[in-house]
A protein has these predicted regions:
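Conserved N-terminal subdomain of the carbohydrate kinase-like
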Residues: 52-138, 311-330
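Glycine-rich phosphate/adenosyl-contacting loop at the front of the ribokinase-like
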Residues: 1-78, 256, 321-330
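Short, electropositive alpha-helical surface patch
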Residues: 63-77, 182-192, 215-216, 246, ...
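Active-site metal-binding loops of divalent metal-dependent hydrolases
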Residues: 13, 169, 265
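Conserved phosphate-binding/catalytic region of the ribokinase-like
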Residues: 1-8, 156-160, 208-330
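Conserved beta-alpha-beta core of the PfkB/ribokinase-like small-molecule kinase fold
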Residues: 133, 139-218, 234-236
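Short, conserved phosphate/pyrophosphate- and ester-handling motifs at nucleotide-, phospho-/glycolipid
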Residues: 46, 199, 263
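Short beta-strand scaffold segments in enzyme catalytic cores
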Residues: 44, 92-96, 235-238
Length: 330
């Protein structure tokens, strides 16, 4: 009998080909194969920290699908609810390499992929409800209408069972029919979550609010227990339903190599700390730390630390002083 999961998530994993030299993708001659997928990045990060993680998806019966399954096995992620679908392919993407710290160009080849055919038929109640926590992003609901239905099914069932839910909007505007549909759908999904983790630009686009405090207020009014807003190099702002509010300064990074995956690393830090029962201030501090680690290497998940590595960094005791509580927290 399978041990109960700490965390369950779902989404699309893709093979990713990263250019080995900087420059325009059209001129790239050589690539390195890696794995990509926002939800999977979080699953990998949490598994490396010792959590029992299950990931739900569909992959094609092809070499890319085999690569995804091999990665799951290597990372210790439960794949018993990953379906190998012979009818559709596994998606892939190309990513440029930038040496100046700017965001790389990413081109996706995912239309009609196996994962886009995820639906409520993939829901397995015992598997999902056996987990303590559900992590969702806004990517999987965007890839198809049926996958979106599954996202709401997962959130509603976990909420009804009294389990905790975190949600990172992780906007992909090109996958949605309109900005209005995207905002309405993702805000409805956020209303089912305990913890909402948008970036500042994402929060502004989704809520129409400008300040971090007002964006957080929007989601708290929908019933969230807490909202953490990523501020890039400035760190992150948090506000909770029980009145805590503050800003945690960002980690200094002298050599930014690959910005993709920073938000997923941040989510790993916040979610892992909350599952350990740590205070929100500590969770945001860890989120900043792991997000900073993620951007110092090539690849979306390669910089995510093991538990031993994280413990060494946190035991240095140099980051707690970076928490700056506002008056509202006292």
């Amino acid at each position: 009998m399978q041990a109960a999961l700490d965390v369950v998530t779902y989404g699309e994993a893709m093979a990713m080909f990263v250019a080995t030299e900087p420059g325009h993708l059209a001129h790239a001659a050589q690539f390195t194969k890696r794995i990509a997928g926002a939800d999977l990045n979080v699953a990998i990060g949490l598994s490396r920290l010792g959590f029992k993680v299950g990931w739900m998806s569909r992959v094609g019966r092809d070499s890319f699908g085999g690569y995804v399954l091999d990665t799951l096995a290597r990372e210790g992620i439960d794949a018993s609810c990953v379906t190998v679908d012979p009818r559709y392919p596994t998606g892939f993407q190309l990513k440029s390499r930038n040496d100046d710290g700017s965001d790389p160009t990413v081109e996706y080849f995912r239309k009609g992929s196996a994962a886009s055919h995820l639906s409520c038929d993939d829901y397995v109640a015992d598997y999902v409800l056996g987990a303590r926590h559900l992590h969702l992003t806004g990517v999987a609901p965007a890839i198809s209408a049926t996958s979106c239905e599954l996202a709401f099914k997962l959130a509603r069932e976990m909420r009804a069972a009294g389990k905790s839910i975190s949600f990172d909007p992780n906007l992909r505007p090109t996958l949605w029919p309109s900005a209005e549909v995207m905002a309405n759908t993702l805000n409805a999904l956020a209303a089912l979550a305990d913890w909402v983790l948008p970036g500042l630009a994402e929060g502004r686009q989704l809520t129409g609010c400008e300040s971090p405090a007002d964006i957080a207020g929007f989601y708290l009014a929908q019933g969230a227990r807490g909202v953490v807003i990523k501020l890039g190099a400035e760190g992150a702002y948090y506000r909770t339903a029980d009145g805590r509010e503050g800003t945690v300064a960002g980690e200094r990074v002298d050599n930014v190599v690959d910005t993709v995956g920073a938000g997923d690393g941040f989510a790993v830090g916040v979610v892992s700390a909350l599952l350990e029962g740590r205070a929100i201030e500590q969770a945001v501090t860890r989120g900043n730390l792991i997000g900073a680690l993620a951007i110092q290497v090539i690849g979306d998940s390669e910089g995510l630390p093991t538990r031993a590595a994280l413990d060494r960094l946190e035991s240095a005791g140099q980051r707690a002083e970076r928490i700056e509580e506002t008056a509202a927290a006292h």
